[in-house]
């Protein structure tokens, strides 16, 4: 330990930068450097790495332990540059990762969830703190009694008790600042990490790019969309079956297969081109202006997932007056700005009629739809702007760095 502390102190002494050095722990960067496209990576790349660095804060992205490839010896880290941010994969050998971290002398860690413990286990400074941003805590009972009810196909269970125990231990050592994107997630986090109810958890809502110039136009809102990766827990096949049974409406799938592609395509085979119903279109992954235009024309977002936190896709859609019809609820967002059809366990095909009733209501009742759509737009502008996110997250970073 004294050796690594000496390395850190020497490195800090000769550092030209006096900024707060933040290491962002994540396992994806929304396609950057060949990583996966997902909600955590989206937050990391599009918001934290883009808007938090300033004259007082600098951020590196740590993507865990590097893989065995490229011919690079296992004692070296791997570095790439993306969007003006350095992305690092640590050496495969723990001693050299600990040495590398000491030389980098980060002031604190920031993690969107915590999907891997390699970096924190290699950190030899037992005073260094972690800001843990809760997005989607999943206790073991959730895997067993909810996600585990799926029969035809399942995503692998990524429950890892050793990570949750590490978080518990760091909390006992007063080395963690918990923040959450939704207050309804707090009981789940307390259960997952075996924490006391008195543990403080600060509210830091997820940000989205909000078009404040957008003006709601009822005449544009005529499509029904699915927005997300085509993976088992998302259960896109329910959306597709709804489309097949409701040919009077236009349905659009926005998202790609990424993990376990063959299994997921097999589950979806009767709905994919060329077998897809005429009113069901697959757009693949979309971003930028194309995505904005599709959201502007969407009247309803259908969420068929068996489990989620609070998806970024919800907030993006709400900002354009697209209401949500969902099989799960978080922070009362669905009830306020759409309709909760009730819990849907298993593969979910028996829920199609519940979705159909709600869809008909919002496609045909303009008065109800406009009321909830306009309220949704106002809500997102008041609570999920980049300006508010920057102020809140920077305050958290400064307070933890000074503590």
Per-region residue spans from a language model:
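A charged, aromatic-enriched C-terminal amphipathic alpha-helix characteristic of glycosyltransferases
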Residues: 363-398
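Short hydrophobic beta-strand element within catalytic cores of glycosyltransferases
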Residues: 323-333
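A conserved mid-protein helix/loop that constitutes part of the nucleotide-sugar donor-binding site
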Residues: 39-46, 231-245
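Membrane-proximal helix-turn-helix segments that form the acceptor-binding/catalytic region
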Residues: 138, 149-179
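Aromatic "clamp/platform" in nucleotide-sugar-dependent glycosyltransferases that forms part
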Residues: 306
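Glycosyltransferase donor-sugar binding loop
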Residues: 63-67, 250-267, 282-285
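Short His-centered aromatic/hydrophobic patch
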Residues: 111-116, 134-135
């Amino acid at each position: 330990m004294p050796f690594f502390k000496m390395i850190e102190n020497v490195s800090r002494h000769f550092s030209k930068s006096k900024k707060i050095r933040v290491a962002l722990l994540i396992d994806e960067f929304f396609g950057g450097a060949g990583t996966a496209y997902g909600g955590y990576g989206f937050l990391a790349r599009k918001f934290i790495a883009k808007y938090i660095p300033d004259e007082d804060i600098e951020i590196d992205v740590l993507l865990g332990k590097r893989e065995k490839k490229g011919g690079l010896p296992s004692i070296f880290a791997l570095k790439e540059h993306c969007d003006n941010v350095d992305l690092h994969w640590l050496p495969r050998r723990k001693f050299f990762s600990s040495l590398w971290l000491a030389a980098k002398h980060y002031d604190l860690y920031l993690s969107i969830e915590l999907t891997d413990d390699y970096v924190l286990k290699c950190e030899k400074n037992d005073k260094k703190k972690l800001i843990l941003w809760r997005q989607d805590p999943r206790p073991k009972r959730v895997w067993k009694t909810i996600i585990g009810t799926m029969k035809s196909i399942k995503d692998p269970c990524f429950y890892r008790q050793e990570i949750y125990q590490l978080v518990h231990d760091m909390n006992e050592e007063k080395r963690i600042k918990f923040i959450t994107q939704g207050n309804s997630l707090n009981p789940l986090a307390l259960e997952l990490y075996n924490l006391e109810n008195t543990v403080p958890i600060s509210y830091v809502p997820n940000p989205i790019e909000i078009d404040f110039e957008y003006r709601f136009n009822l005449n544009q809102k005529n499509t029904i969309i699915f927005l997300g990766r085509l993976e088992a827990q998302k259960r896109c096949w329910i959306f597709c079956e709804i489309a097949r049974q409701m040919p009077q409406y236009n349905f659009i799938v926005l998202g790609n297969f990424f993990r376990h592609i063959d299994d997921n395509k097999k589950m979806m085979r009767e709905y994919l081109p060329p077998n897809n119903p005429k009113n069901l279109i697959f757009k693949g992954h979309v971003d930028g202006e194309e995505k904005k235009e599709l959201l502007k024309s969407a009247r309803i977002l259908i969420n068929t997932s068996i489990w989620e936190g609070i998806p970024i896709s919800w907030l993006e859609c709400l900002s354009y007056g697209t209401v949500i019809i969902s099989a799960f609820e978080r922070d009362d967002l669905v009830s306020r700005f759409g309709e909760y059809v009730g819990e849907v366990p298993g593969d979910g095909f028996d829920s199609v009629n519940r979705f159909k009733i709600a869809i008909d209501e919002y496609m045909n009742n303009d008065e109800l739809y406009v009321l909830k759509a306009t309220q949704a737009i106002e809500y997102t502008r008041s609570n999920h702007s980049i300006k508010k996110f920057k102020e809140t997250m920077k305050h958290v970073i400064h307070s933890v760095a000074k503590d």
